[in-house]
């Protein structure tokens, strides 16, 4: 299990329906550069700009889309892409520490749950919407060595979405995935817009 916690200790990812991926890919101008690799080895593949790195895992009717740049995809874009569809967004960063879970559906943000620590000791919560069924998971399975169990909340949500136990999530580290590159210009555009929105 610790391999799973270690991998997701600093990750951002989406879960989107398969039929939405073409629109998502076109919007980001994704360029496929490798196939049939795994998340176990993906960090060993160097790309000049880590923000340009995006990977996908095919899970029958949905994709897990992982990449640091997902942090910079603004809310408006996700709302637009969720038209007649859904998008789940997740972020875990133990180094801050912080975590985020968002659920978009039919151009609406239905649920947002974010935790971070302020003043070193106080856990701050930002919450929109009511807790959903997919957020009810067996918390006893999340026991990370670093002691930040509550910040792995997104893994509990993902286990319910994939209808598996949290302990079984480690299998996805060995699933075949595809590696894409986002053009540097597109990454800069996403980042600039993200920083601009922070100033508002």
Locate the predicted segments by residue.
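Short, extreme N-terminal segment that most often corresponds to the first beta-strand
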Residues: 1-34, 196-200
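Intrinsic disorder/low-complexity signal
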Residues: 1, 26, 57-60, 65, ...
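Short, flexible coil/linker segments at or flanking structured domains
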Residues: 2-4, 78, 89-92, 98, ...
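Long, compositionally biased intrinsically disordered terminal regions
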Residues: 117-200
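Short, intrinsically disordered low-complexity segments
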Residues: 33-115
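Residue-level signal for functionally critical sites in structured catalytic/ligand-binding pockets
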Residues: 4-10, 41-42, 105, 109, ...
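Broad structural signal for hydrophobic residues in well-ordered alpha-helices, predominantly aliphatic
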Residues: 24, 77-81, 158
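Alpha-helical protein-protein interaction elements
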Residues: 5-6, 31, 87, 172, ...
